From Swiss-Prot:
The lineage of its organism: Eukaryota, Fungi, Dikarya, Ascomycota, Saccharomycotina. The gene is AIM23. This is Altered inheritance of mitochondria protein 23, mitochondrial. It comes from Meyerozyma guilliermondii (strain ATCC 6260 / CBS 566 / DSM 6381 / JCM 1539 / NBRC 10279 / NRRL Y-324) (Yeast). Keywords: Mitochondrion, Transit peptide. Residues 64-75, 334-348 have a biased composition (Basic and acidic residues). Its main location: mitochondrion.
């Protein structure tokens, strides 16, 4: 520690990032203040340098942490945003279709109609025809279906005209609903077989197309100028009545036999015969009849007989042509009142049932009287 005549004493103090250094420089040759005994030299106090010791803790108060309470708060945070109002949504109504009547096929058919309606209206709202009020009535399909008796009635769907409108529901007979359902299934199956390349399906389709063309073709009934009066009044008369009873449009062609083939071939073409409307055909004055030949008189007689047949039946017709070559009747049967016929048939059935019940009652009364007579005779004999 001491060398020569010069000595240096150093005293250092460190506390909390502060360093204090005090150096004392003694005067030269001032050895009086120094202790010559090495054994009696003072030890350095290291505890005084401990900033976090007990002495420092007791000497200087510790400042409180002003952020401690901020993070130790247990109260909920304040939300300055306004509270959202909870919207109470109405629960969706369960759609339940109930089929308590009808066969399994009828139930499958009405399920197909329900699926078709759902493809147009997801809410099952429809315009209903047949409520008795007249016009369209907006209803729910569940109310219509659940009120149906599938053993008697069915429904069918009419697609809407645009995306904003609702489908139309009409009632029909359950047999018609089942038939449309089975036809739809058959068509889907046929398309599936055609895609697979089935030869049988191709033959069936071709035969059906031929049948449809034949059905849609205009029917032609021919009458020859050389027909006898008996054949005209019997055979041709029944043929014409059958055509009228079917209610289909048909042509009645009067001409030579050799022109029948061309008449049938050109019947489907519009104005193929090239005949002008001549409603005055057959209106011949009596003074002109004397100058007519036998053939012309025969043709006039055939024409008048056919015209009388059409007049007596419920049929409208237009005449074109002339007696010299050919005459064409374009016939359109009138629509019959089917309701009146149905009511007549029902009334006839009711009258038959009433008469049968009366006969049964009369027979019972007669039997009871005979039994009483036999009892009385038995008692008299006793």
């Amino acid at each position: 520690m001491l060398r020569g005549s010069r000595s240096v004493g150093v005293y250092a103090v460190c506390s909390c990032r502060q360093f204090t250094c005090v150096s004392a420089r003694l005067k030269p040759f001032d050895l009086g203040s120094l202790k010559t005994n090495n054994n009696q030299s003072e030890t350095f106090n290291f505890e005084s340098m401990n900033r976090f010791g007990d002495s420092s803790a007791t000497s200087r108060p510790i400042k409180e942490n002003r952020f401690a309470q901020k993070f130790e708060k247990s109260a909920p945070k304040k939300n300055n945003y306004p509270k959202r109002q909870e919207k109470h949504r109405n629960p969706r109504k369960a759609v339940r279709f109930q089929f308590e009547s009808g066969s399994v096929q009828a139930q499958n058919a009405i399920k197909a109609v329900i699926n078709e309606v759902h493809s147009y209206s997801k809410s099952y709202k429809v315009n209903y025809v047949g409520s008795g009020k007249g016009g369209l009535e907006q209803k729910h399909l569940v109310d219509i279906v659940n009120s149906l008796d599938l053993a008697v009635n069915g429904i069918y769907c009419v697609p809407p005209t645009d995306d904003k409108s609702l489908p139309i529901i009409k009632t029909n007979k359950v047999q018609e609903m089942i038939k449309s359902y089975t036809d739809k299934l058959a068509l889907e199956k046929e398309q599936e077989l055609l895609q697979k390349g089935s030869i049988v399906a191709q033959k069936v389709m071709r035969s059906r197309d031929r049948a449809e063309k034949k059905k849609s073709a205009t029917k032609v009934s021919t009458v020859s100028w050389g027909i006898s009066n008996s054949d005209l009044c019997n055979q041709k008369a029944t043929e014409i009545q059958k055509r009228i009873s079917k209610g289909e449009h048909f042509l009645l062609y009067l001409g030579e036999k050799k022109s029948f083939y061309s008449a049938r071939q050109s019947a489907s073409k519009e104005n193929a015969f090239g005949l002008k409307d001549t409603p005055e055909v057959g209106d011949i004055a009596e003074e002109d009849l004397a100058g007519m030949s036998v053939e012309e008189r025969k043709r006039l007689s055939i024409f008048q007989t056919v015209k009388t047949m059409l007049d007596d039946s419920s049929c409208q017709y237009e005449i074109s042509g002339d007696l010299e070559s050919r005459v064409l009747f374009s016939c359109q049967p009138l629509e019959r009142d089917t309701k009146s016929k149905d009511t007549e048939q029902k009334e006839a059935k009711k009258s038959k049932k009433a008469s049968a019940s009366k006969q049964a009652d009369n027979s019972k009364k007669a039997m009871s009287e005979d039994e009483l007579d036999s009892l009385y005779s038995f008692k008299i004999e006793d």
